Amino acid sequence: VPRTVADLQQKHRAYQEIAQSNSGMLGRTPDFLNTGMAVLAERAAFLGQNQYTDFAANARNYAKEVKANDIFISHALQNPQLNRQKAINAIPSGYAGVHTIERNQDGIFVSGAKMVNTMAPIADDLLIFNPPELLLENGDSSYAVAFATPLNNPGVKIICRKLLDHPTASITDYPLSNALDEIDAYIVFDHAFIPWSKVFVENNVEMSNRFFIDSGMFSHTSHQDEVRGITKLELATSLALRIAHILGLDGFLGVQEKLGRLTANLELIKGTITRSEDNGHLDEFGIYTPNLQALQAVRSTLPEYYDEALRVTQHLAAGSMVGVPSFAEFDGDNATILNQALTTDRATAKTRTRLLNLAFDLTSSGFGQRQLMYEYYHGGDPMRIRAQHYQRADLQAGNQMIDRLLSADNANTHE
């Protein structure tokens, strides 16, 4: 748990080291939720209790268990998109979210579903709660739950999406797809039993709506996520620059201008992350918390910068990337021809092919497109993120200047 800005900066370095080990392609490594659980344990008092259990104590004890046993937690908060025009309790299928169907002295039984649970197949536990941007209403009380459960709970089903790897191709042809396909899954609960000791919210709409924000998890998991985002953006930016150089395009002013936009974008994101740390605050529990407004600025902007880096790489690599041969061709009859035809004064044929394969995998393969989609939407609805950023903007200095100018104008007006 960070107590000073130096602690937060140290966590930044740890997040960065983990992200660099996977080139920023794994969005939900264990450090994401583990940092949130550490903070939840400190702030858990708001969870209160009911006639069966002490929710605050449950959160604290679970955090200790996670730390002691090095538990990898995945999470699922988004409800399936079935009918957004109806309240969640008015959708008859029972799969519009996860809801309590029975409770007794030992715990609760839940059924329902959550979508886009990343890393579920390899995680140990699953944390379930509701998204803060889609608030529950009073009639939704059975859906007002937050709990943790092992993913091997007999009542939990993991339904994975289609794989994006290429098992018949080598890792040289698909260096990302064949190594870093982070699996997303649809999670179904079928009368799954959750003991009270692992329940943090139950039958309490207000607490369900407050859980992610008031727990402090949002700010601290956002910090981890944006450090990972920097790493991913740095890979995409560096790849565009390397492509331009290897293909002999970096001497043209127009290309340099495109690349300069990418490097400027990267610096802006790095600077904003630093601002989130330097302008953080010590909360009432003594936790040094990053500036969420700065982090949300990154979340609303980084996906577009990442998208731009991919598009620049596509435009520069173009036909060279689309027509790149399988690396297996270098072991066949065409090896001599390819070595002669594709070698330049800037790269051997094999180096050029490896680079173009990487460019295709990141920008144009199914894996690459999933990564782009993930970057846009994994942090929540981009429209809501920007609307909330506007609502929380601190423009006191700007408004004071406007008021001063208007006041000066009035003072010089003869009525």
At which residue positions do the language-model features occur?
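FAD-binding core of flavoproteins
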Residues: 75, 80-225, 391-414
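Alpha-helical scaffold segments in carbohydrate-active enzymes
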Residues: 61, 65-68, 261-272, 301-308
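Extended amphipathic alpha-helical segments enriched in small hydrophobics
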Residues: 224-282
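Alpha-helix capping/hinge segments and adjacent helical runs
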Residues: 293-415
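Internal helix-loop-helix
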Residues: 1-73, 125
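Active/binding-pocket-proximal capping segment
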Residues: 276-285, 323, 327-330
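Charged/polar positions within long, soluble alpha-helices
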Residues: 78, 245, 271-278, 307-314, ...
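Short, charged, amphipathic alpha-helical segments
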Residues: 253-260, 288-296
